[in-house]
Amino acid sequence: MDYCSKPEEVAQNPLAFRLMVLISNDNEAAFDFIWRCWNFFHLLDDLIDRDKPVTIQEASRELFLFTQTIALNPFFQQNKFSLLPMILNACNGWVVGEEASEANKQYAPVLKCSDFNIYSHVAFLVGGWEHMRYVDSKFRTYDKE
Protein backbone atom coordinates (compact mmCIF):
# COMPACT_ATOMS: atom_id res chain seq x y z
CA MET A 1 0.00 0.00 0.00
CA ASP A 2 1.30 3.45 -0.88
CA TYR A 3 2.13 5.61 2.13
CA CYS A 4 -0.56 8.17 1.30
CA SER A 5 -3.17 5.47 0.67
CA LYS A 6 -3.23 4.55 4.36
CA PRO A 7 -6.59 5.44 5.96
CA GLU A 8 -5.07 8.07 8.25
CA GLU A 9 -3.32 9.78 5.32
CA VAL A 10 -6.47 9.69 3.18
CA ALA A 11 -8.41 11.21 6.09
CA GLN A 12 -5.88 14.03 6.32
CA ASN A 13 -5.71 14.64 2.56
CA PRO A 14 -8.95 13.22 1.13
CA LEU A 15 -8.65 15.01 -2.22
CA ALA A 16 -4.97 14.30 -2.88
CA PHE A 17 -5.39 11.31 -5.17
CA ARG A 18 -8.10 12.99 -7.27
CA LEU A 19 -6.00 16.15 -7.53
CA MET A 20 -3.05 14.13 -8.81
CA VAL A 21 -5.33 12.58 -11.44
CA LEU A 22 -6.49 16.07 -12.43
CA ILE A 23 -2.94 17.40 -12.59
CA SER A 24 -1.69 14.53 -14.75
CA ASN A 25 -4.34 15.16 -17.42
CA ASP A 26 -4.67 11.46 -18.43
CA ASN A 27 -0.89 11.05 -18.69
CA GLU A 28 -0.23 7.82 -16.78
CA ALA A 29 3.52 8.33 -16.46
CA ALA A 30 3.01 11.90 -15.20
CA PHE A 31 0.52 10.60 -12.63
CA ASP A 32 2.96 7.91 -11.49
CA PHE A 33 5.67 10.56 -11.06
CA ILE A 34 3.61 13.04 -9.04
CA TRP A 35 1.87 10.39 -6.96
CA ARG A 36 5.24 8.93 -6.07
CA CYS A 37 6.55 12.40 -5.16
CA TRP A 38 3.48 13.05 -3.01
CA ASN A 39 3.97 9.78 -1.12
CA PHE A 40 7.71 10.17 -0.63
CA PHE A 41 7.54 13.81 0.46
CA HIS A 42 4.77 13.09 2.98
CA LEU A 43 6.65 10.14 4.42
CA LEU A 44 9.84 12.19 4.67
CA ASP A 45 7.96 15.01 6.40
CA ASP A 46 6.52 12.57 8.93
CA LEU A 47 9.99 11.15 9.58
CA ILE A 48 11.50 14.59 10.15
CA ASP A 49 8.63 16.07 12.18
CA ARG A 50 8.17 12.82 14.12
CA ASP A 51 4.47 13.60 14.39
CA LYS A 52 3.42 10.23 12.97
CA PRO A 53 5.04 6.82 13.30
CA VAL A 54 6.80 5.59 10.17
CA THR A 55 7.99 2.00 9.98
CA ILE A 56 11.29 0.98 8.45
CA GLN A 57 9.34 -1.03 5.88
CA GLU A 58 7.31 2.04 4.85
CA ALA A 59 10.41 4.23 4.64
CA SER A 60 12.42 1.66 2.68
CA ARG A 61 9.57 0.93 0.28
CA GLU A 62 8.87 4.60 -0.49
CA LEU A 63 12.58 5.36 -0.93
CA PHE A 64 12.89 2.50 -3.40
CA LEU A 65 9.73 3.44 -5.32
CA PHE A 66 10.77 7.10 -5.52
CA THR A 67 14.25 6.12 -6.73
CA GLN A 68 12.78 3.69 -9.24
CA THR A 69 10.46 6.41 -10.55
CA ILE A 70 13.30 8.89 -10.99
CA ALA A 71 15.38 6.25 -12.75
CA LEU A 72 12.78 4.65 -15.00
CA ASN A 73 9.64 6.78 -15.35
CA PRO A 74 9.34 7.92 -18.99
CA PHE A 75 7.66 11.23 -18.06
CA PHE A 76 10.46 12.09 -15.65
CA GLN A 77 13.12 11.00 -18.13
CA GLN A 78 11.60 13.13 -20.88
CA ASN A 79 11.37 16.18 -18.58
CA LYS A 80 14.21 15.62 -16.13
CA PHE A 81 16.04 18.83 -16.99
CA SER A 82 13.08 20.91 -15.86
CA LEU A 83 11.81 18.59 -13.10
CA LEU A 84 15.08 18.04 -11.25
CA PRO A 85 15.53 21.77 -10.49
CA MET A 86 11.93 21.82 -9.25
CA ILE A 87 12.72 18.95 -6.86
CA LEU A 88 15.85 20.79 -5.72
CA ASN A 89 13.81 23.93 -5.09
CA ALA A 90 11.24 21.95 -3.08
CA CYS A 91 13.99 20.41 -0.96
CA ASN A 92 15.54 23.81 -0.33
CA GLY A 93 12.16 25.36 0.52
CA TRP A 94 11.58 22.64 3.04
CA VAL A 95 14.92 23.33 4.75
CA VAL A 96 14.31 27.10 4.72
CA GLY A 97 10.86 26.53 6.23
CA GLU A 98 12.28 24.33 8.99
CA GLU A 99 15.02 26.86 9.75
CA ALA A 100 12.72 29.90 9.74
CA SER A 101 13.29 32.21 12.67
CA GLU A 102 10.54 32.68 15.21
CA ALA A 103 9.68 36.01 13.56
CA ASN A 104 9.11 34.24 10.24
CA LYS A 105 7.47 30.99 11.42
CA GLN A 106 4.19 32.06 9.80
CA TYR A 107 5.83 31.53 6.40
CA ALA A 108 7.21 28.07 7.21
CA PRO A 109 4.19 26.06 5.96
CA VAL A 110 4.28 27.88 2.62
CA LEU A 111 8.00 27.30 2.22
CA LYS A 112 7.70 23.66 3.26
CA CYS A 113 5.01 23.11 0.61
CA SER A 114 7.28 23.99 -2.30
CA ASP A 115 6.45 20.58 -3.76
CA PHE A 116 3.23 22.24 -4.98
CA ASN A 117 5.40 23.97 -7.57
CA ILE A 118 6.40 20.56 -8.92
CA TYR A 119 2.76 19.59 -9.35
CA SER A 120 1.96 22.91 -11.00
CA HIS A 121 4.89 22.46 -13.39
CA VAL A 122 3.75 18.95 -14.27
CA ALA A 123 0.29 20.34 -15.03
CA PHE A 124 1.92 22.78 -17.45
CA LEU A 125 4.01 20.07 -19.09
CA VAL A 126 1.02 17.80 -19.73
CA GLY A 127 -1.64 20.40 -20.50
CA GLY A 128 -0.19 23.84 -21.09
CA TRP A 129 -0.85 27.19 -19.46
CA GLU A 130 -4.64 26.95 -19.15
CA HIS A 131 -4.48 23.49 -17.57
CA MET A 132 -1.83 24.67 -15.11
CA ARG A 133 -3.94 27.70 -14.13
CA TYR A 134 -7.05 25.55 -13.70
CA VAL A 135 -5.18 23.00 -11.59
CA ASP A 136 -3.63 25.73 -9.45
CA SER A 137 -7.07 27.19 -8.74
CA LYS A 138 -8.07 23.82 -7.29
CA PHE A 139 -4.81 22.61 -5.78
CA ARG A 140 -3.47 25.65 -3.99
CA THR A 141 -6.59 25.97 -1.86
CA TYR A 142 -7.36 22.31 -1.12
CA ASP A 143 -5.61 22.25 2.26
CA LYS A 144 -6.61 25.08 4.56
CA GLU A 145 -4.13 24.10 7.29
Where are these regions (language model features)?
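All-alpha prenyltransferase/terpene-synthase fold signal
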Residues: 1-145
